[in-house]
C-alpha cells in the first residue's frame, strides 16, 4: 500500500530517491518523505502532505544532498493524512525508518516503549519501529544487529528500511509479507518495493523472502534471517524497460494501458498458440501430473481479479465439465473449508503480493492442498513463489490504480487454463465441446476493434458525468463484466454504480430505475439474448435510459431512450474479453469529464499488501 526506496551510493542519492518515489506513487500518494545522512552524518528529513511533486519542491528548496538515504510514499492506514504521520519516522534524531505494511501488535509495543520513557509524536505504527531500533541500538554492536532484534518483536506485515547517524555507511532493510527487493550496482546497493523504482540505477536485482534482514553498504551486501544466520538470494536481470513505465504520448497511464491490450493479450497467448497447448511448455514442469484427474477447481482472488475468476469458473464448467468455485481471498481464509486432494487451487493477482489472496493460498496449503497454480503479472512475487505452478500474464507494468490490461490478460490465461484442463490426462470423457483454441488468434484484433469505438464512447461518457448513480446489467459470462464496469466507474469517476444479473431486476433493483438512472447493458448475441432483451424492456417501460453494448450481428436498434453501440461479431466464449474494453473506456472518459485523478483515485492504492 506504500512504497519505499533508497540505498547507499558513492554519489548523491537524493535524485534517485525522488525519481524512485515518483515511480512508486501508484502504491500510495497521501504524503511522501525522505531522510538522508548529510556530509557530517547528520540525519536530515523532509516530509510533505500530497504528491511527490510537493516533496521534490521542498527538497530542492533545502538543497539536500547525501549518499545514504531512504524514501517513502504513503497510503494512510494508521493515523490521518498529516505531516506528523508521514514517513520517515525518527527516534532521538538518530534513527530513521520507512515502512510499508501494518504492525498488528503496535499498541502493546507502544505501551512498553512509553513505559520505558519514549515519546511519540505521531499516530502511526511505524514510529514504534524507529523507537525499537533505537532501544536495541543502545546495546547492539551495530545497526544491523539492532534491526534484527527489533523486527523480532514485530507481528504483522512489513517491509522496512532503517538508517542511523551512528552508522553512517549503512542501510538495513527487512521483509515480512510485503514486497521488497535489492538492487546491485557498481556504485552501491539499493532497495525498493518495486523494480520500476530501481531502473534508473540498475537492472540487477535480488528478491527478499519473508524473514530476511539485509545490510546494505556501498561495497557490501549481507542477507541473514532474524537470528543472524546467512541467507542467499539469487540475482536476476530485470527485463523491464524504462519506457514501459513512462506515459509516452498518453494523458494517463490508464489510457495507455487500455490501448496496450491488443498487444498484451497477444503476448499472453503467444506461448500457447506456438506450443499447441503443450502442458509443460505452457504451465511448467509437473503440469501434466498436477492437472491429471483434477475433479474441481477453486479460484481465489480479490477485486478485479475476482471478477476474472467469476468468468473463469464458468469456462471451466462449460469446457472441462467439472465443478468450479470462485471465492474472495479474504473470505476463504477465515471460513471452514473441506479439502479435496484432487482440487486445483488457482490464485490470481496482478502484483503477486495481494495479501488477502496470499493468505488464502497459505490457508489452502495448510488444509493440505498441493495442486496450486498462480496466475500473475509479476514473475518473482510472493504468490507465484509460493505456488507449485505459475503462469505469467505478459501485460507489462500496470501503473494505473484501476486495473485494465491485467484483467483482460487474466481472462486470456483463464481460458487457456480451461482448454489445458480439457486435454489433461484423464479429462477426455468429461469434457464438453464448447472450448476451442481456434478463435484465440482473432482475439487481439477483436480487442482492437472494440478500442476503435472510443470516439462514440466519449459521447456516452459525457452523459454519465452529471449522474449520481448508474446500474450495470449482464447475464451468464457477462455478468462479471457488468460487475467490472460498475467497479471501474465508481473507482475513478466516483459515480455510485452497482451491477446485477439482469434476471434479478424484478427481485429488487428495478425500484432504483428512473430517468436519472443510466442503465448499461452488456448484450452479446448469445443464447441469453432474448431473456436479456425482456429485462431491458422492463427498464425502458419505467423510463430508464439504456446504454447497450451489443454485437454487430445482434438485432438491437437505437431508439428514444435506447443507445446502442456495436462491438465485433460475437466472439463466443471469448466475448467477455472483448466486452471488457468498452466499459473500461466508459469509466475512463466519464472520469475525464468529471475531472477526477484517473490514475490515482482517492482512498485507493494499486497493491493491497495489508489486510
Swiss-Prot record:
Keywords on record? Aminotransferase, Cytoplasm, Glutamine amidotransferase, Repeat, Transferase
Q: What InterPro entries is this protein classified in?
A: GATase_2_dom, GFAT, GFAT_N, GlmS/AgaS_SIS, GlmS/FrlB_SIS, Ntn_hydrolases_N, SIS_dom, SIS_dom_sf
Q: Cellular component per GO?
A: cytosol
GO BP annotations of the record are: carbohydrate metabolic process; fructose 6-phosphate metabolic process; protein N-linked glycosylation; UDP-N-acetylglucosamine metabolic process
Top-rank lineage group of the source organism: Bacteria
Give the residue spans that cross the bilayer: none
Which cellular compartments is it found in? Answer: Cytoplasm
Give residue ranges for domain Glutamine amidotransferase type-2. 2-219
Residue ranges occupied by any SIS domain in the UniProt entry: 287-427, 460-601
Gene3D superfamilies per record: Glucose-6-phosphate isomerase like protein, domain 1, Glutamine Phosphoribosylpyrophosphate, subunit 1, domain 1
Quote the EC number.
2.6.1.16
Q: Does the keyword Transferase apply?
A: yes
Q: Name one GO molecular function term.
A: glutamine-fructose-6-phosphate transaminase (isomerizing) activity
Instruction: Give the positions the UniProt entry annotates as the active site.
Output: 2 (nucleophile), 606 (for fru-6p isomerization activity)
| Keyword Kinase recorded | no
Catalytic activity reads: D-fructose 6-phosphate + L-glutamine = D-glucosamine 6-phosphate + L-glutamate
Predominant place of localization: cytoplasm
- HAMAP family annotated for this entry? GlmS
Q: How does it assemble?
A: Homodimer.
Q: What does this protein do?
A: Catalyzes the first step in hexosamine metabolism, converting fructose-6P into glucosamine-6P using glutamine as a nitrogen source.
- Report the protein name in the record: Glutamine--fructose-6-phosphate aminotransferase [isomerizing]
Q: Which organism is it from?
A: Acidithiobacillus ferridurans
Amino acid at each position: 500500500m506504500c512504497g519505499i526506496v533508497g540505498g547507499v551510493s558513492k554519489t548523491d542519492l537524493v535524485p534517485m530517491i525522488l525519481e524512485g518515489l515518483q515511480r512508486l506513487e501508484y502504491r500510495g500518494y497521501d504524503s511522501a518523505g525522505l531522510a538522508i545522512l548529510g556530509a557530517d552524518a547528520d540525519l536530515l528529513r523532509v516530509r510533505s502532505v500530497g504528491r511527490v511533486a510537493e516533496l521534490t519542491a521542498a527538497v530542492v528548496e533545502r538543497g539536500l544532498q547525501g549518499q545514504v538515504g531512504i524514501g517513502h510514499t504513503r497510503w494512510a492506514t494508521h493515523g490521518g493524512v498529516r505531516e506528523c504521520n508521514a514517513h520517515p519516522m525518527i527516534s532521538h534524531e538518530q534513527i530513521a525508518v520507512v515502512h510499508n505494511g501494518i504492525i498488528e501488535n503496535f499498541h502493546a509495543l507502544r505501551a512498553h516503549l512509553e513505559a520505558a520513557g519514549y515519546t511519540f509524536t505521531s499516530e502511526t505504527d511505524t514510529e514504534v519501529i524507529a523507537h525499537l531500533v533505537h532501544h536495541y541500538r543502545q546495546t547492539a554492536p551495530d545497526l544491523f544487529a539492532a534491526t534484527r532484534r527489533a523486527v523480532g518483536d514485530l507481528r504483522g506485515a512489513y517491509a522496512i528500511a532503517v538508517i542511523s547517524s551512528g552508522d553512517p555507511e549503512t542501510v538495513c532493510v527487512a521483509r515480512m509479507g510485503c514486497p521488497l527487493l535489492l538492487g546491485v550496482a557498481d556504485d552501491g546497493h539499493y532497495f525498493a518495493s518495486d523494480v520500476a523504482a530501481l531502473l534508473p540505477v540498475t537492472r540487477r536485482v535480488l528478491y527478499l523472502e519473508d524473514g530476511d534482514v539485509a545490510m546494505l553498504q556501498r561495497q557490501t551486501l549481507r542477507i541473514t534471517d532474524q537470528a543472524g544466520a546467512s541467507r542467499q538470494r539469487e540475482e536476476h536481470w530485470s527485463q523491464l524497460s524504462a519506457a514501459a513505465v513512462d506515459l509516452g504520448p498518453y494523458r494517463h497511464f490508464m489510457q495507455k494501458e487500455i490501448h496496450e491490450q491488443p498487444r498484451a493479450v497477444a503476448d499472453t497467448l503467444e506461448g500457447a498458440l506456438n506450443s499447441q497447448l503443450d502442458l509443460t511448455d505452457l504451465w511448467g514442469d509437473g503440469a501434466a501430473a498436477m492437472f491429471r484427474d483434477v475433479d474441481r477447481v477453486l479460484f481465489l482472488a480479490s477485486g478485479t481479479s475476482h471478477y476474472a475468476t467469476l468468468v473463469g469458473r464458468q469456462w471451466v464448467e462449460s469446457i472441462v465439465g467439472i465443478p468450479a468455485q470462485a471465492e474472495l481471498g479474504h473470505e476463504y481464509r477465515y471460513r471452514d473449508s473441506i479439502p479435496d486432494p484432487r482440487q486445483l487451487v488457482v490464485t490470481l493477482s496482478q502484483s503477486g503480493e495481494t495479501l488477502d489472496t496470499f493468505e488464502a493460498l497459505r490457508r489452502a496449503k495448510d488444509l493440505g492442498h498441493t495442486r496450486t497454480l498462480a496466475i500473475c503479472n509479476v514473475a518473482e512475487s510472493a504468490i507465484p513463489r509460493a505456488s507449485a505452478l505459475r503462469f505469467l500474464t505478459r501485460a507489462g507494468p500496470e501503473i494505473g490504480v484501476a486495473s485494465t490490461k491485467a484483467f483482460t490478460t487474466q481472462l486470456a490465461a483463464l481460458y487457456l487454463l480451461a482448454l489445458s484442463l480439457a486435454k489433461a490426462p484423464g479429462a477426455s470423457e468429461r469434457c464438453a465441446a464448447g472450448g476451442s483454441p481456434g478463435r484465440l488468434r482473432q482475439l487481439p484484433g477483436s480487442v482492437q476493434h472494440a478500442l476503435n469505438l472510443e470516439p462514440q464512447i466519449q459521447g456516452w461518457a459525457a452523459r454519465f458525468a452529471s449522474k449520481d448513480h448508474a446500474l450495470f446489467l449482464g447475464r451468464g459470462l457477462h455478468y462479471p463484466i457488468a460487475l467490472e464496469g460498475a467497479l471501474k466507474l465508481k473507482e475513478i469517476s466516483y459515480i455510485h454504480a452497482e451491477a446485477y444479473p439482469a434476471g434479478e431486476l424484478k427481485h429488487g433493483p428495478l425500484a432504483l430505475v428512473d430517468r436519472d438512472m443510466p442503465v448499461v447493458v452488456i448484450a452479446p448475441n448469445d443464447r441469453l439474448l432474448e431473456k436479456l432483451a425482456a429485462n431491458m424492456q422492463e427498464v425502458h417501460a419505467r423510463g430508464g435510459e439504456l446504454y447497450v453494448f451489443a454485437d454487430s450481428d445482434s438485432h438491437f436498434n437505437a431508439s428514444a431512450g435506447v443507445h446502442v453501440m456495436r462491438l465485433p461479431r460475437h466472439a463466443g466464449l471469448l466475448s467477455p474479453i472483448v466486452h471488457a474494453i468498452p466499459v473500461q473506456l466508459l469509466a475512463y472518459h466519464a472520469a475525464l469529464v468529471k475531472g477526477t485523478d484517473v490514475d490515482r483515485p482517492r482512498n485507493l492504492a494499486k497493491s493491497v499488501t495489508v489486510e
